[in-house]
Amino acid sequence: MAKHLFTSESVSEGHPDKIADQISDAVLDAILAQDPKARVACETYVKTGMVLVGGEVTTSAWVDIEEITRKTVREIGYTHSDMGFDADSCAVLNAIGKQSPDINQGVDRADPAEQGAGDQGLMFGYANNETDVLMPAPITYAHALVKRQSEVRKNGTLPWLRPDAKSQVTFAYDDGKIVGIDAVVLSTQHRDDVSQADLIEGVMETIIKPVLPAQWLNKDTKFFINPTGRFVIGGPVGDCGLTGRKIIVDTYGGMARHGGGAFSGKDPSKVDRSAAYAARYVAKNIVAAGLADRCEIQVSYAIGVAEPTSISIETFGTGKVSEDLLIKLVRQHFELRPYGLTAMLDLARPIYQATAAYGHFGRNEFPWEATDKAEALRADAGL
């Protein structure tokens, strides 16, 4: 493999699309806390001075959509009208209805194990051994940059920061191995009274240098900090935000393929979300077991049918055993029917708001990041 560059981006919790994702998942969590069997599909739209929460829900729970929305926006940091978006004064519109009974009859079964998929679709899971969390380095460090921006904004280290921010990191590879970081982009919303010089110094010394490993930075690494020179207008004033519009940020930063389905606002019966989590769990355990250095798995489903319609695995020439054997091991060790994978990963509980910013993968607090199957996979592979 020749030398090449690869780039991934991330966005902060204050980015308009991420505000929408977090509100959708906050509503989902509130419902699941009361009714773990609820069916939820919650979509959010944010723009200057308003939030629209819509979707389809079937549940015995009652939740206060307006209060959940305001609390979420407040925690993100939009608390002043001079930002153009204020948790306490924005309009909150509720357009949630009931899920179609046609979907219910396809999903629900007398035997829970035979629960059908909530929709057709294809999902991918991926892992590689570039980082200790078995994730691609570009997306891992792109997330780390905007997460650090949030930390130093909230703890007052850089009091002129505001919630909206974006990062982008370009890694240089040689023969598939990382040899350095070629370029770093970080754009952050800020107060009007900070100078460009102070902003660049603060971001470099307080955000970039503490996050990016020094051994990957060199004299040729390029840094672009607020390259337009000014980022005062941001958040929902600058752009409208929608749930599900940051699916590459949410997953592998473009290094793996994506089936197209978004995650936030969806309960575990929606395989767009739950099967993508299960696919990550499978891929990570295959890499953790040493059966491949890189692994991508695809699963697909038909609405109302429990068994996956297909399972395929690609190891990009790094596999230690055949891909046919890997598929056999996956069928043997992992439950990929909707009810089974929900039980396997304990997904019917309120854990989702935390996923809605800084990536759904590579964060060990989530159950799909466990590597508890690695030893058994390795043994059964004969290694």
Swiss-Prot record:
Protein's cellular compartments: Cytoplasm
Enzyme Commission number(s): 2.5.1.6
Residues at which ATP binds: H15, D164, A165, K166, R230, F231, D239, R245, K246, A262, K266
Pathway where this protein functions: Amino-acid biosynthesis; S-adenosyl-L-methionine biosynthesis; S-adenosyl-L-methionine from L-methionine: step 1/1
The entry's keywords: ATP-binding, Cytoplasm, Magnesium, Metal-binding, Nucleotide-binding, One-carbon metabolism, Potassium, Transferase
Flexible loop, as annotated region: 99-109
Recorded catalytic activity of this chain's protein: L-methionine + ATP + H2O = S-adenosyl-L-methionine + phosphate + diphosphate
Co-factor binding comment: Binds 2 divalent ions per subunit.
Principal subcellular localization: cytoplasm
Binding annotation for K(+): E43
Residues annotated as binding L-methionine: E56, Q99, D239, K270
Listed CDD domains: S-AdoMet_synt
Molecular-function GO terms, alphabetical: ATP binding; magnesium ion binding; methionine adenosyltransferase activity
UniProt superkingdom: Bacteria
GO cellular component, one term: cytoplasm
Subunit structure: Homotetramer; dimer of dimers.
Family to which the UniProt record says this protein belongs: Belongs to the AdoMet synthase family.
PANTHER family with a match to the protein in the record: S-ADENOSYLMETHIONINE SYNTHETASE (PTHR11964)
Function of the molecule: Catalyzes the formation of S-adenosylmethionine (AdoMet) from methionine and ATP. The overall synthetic reaction is composed of two sequential steps, AdoMet formation and the subsequent tripolyphosphate hydrolysis which occurs prior to release of AdoMet from the enzyme.
HAMAP family for this protein: S_AdoMet_synth1 (MF_00086)
Protein name: S-adenosylmethionine synthase
Taxonomic lineage: Bacteria, Pseudomonadati, Pseudomonadota, Gammaproteobacteria, Alteromonadales
Gene that this sequence comes from: metK
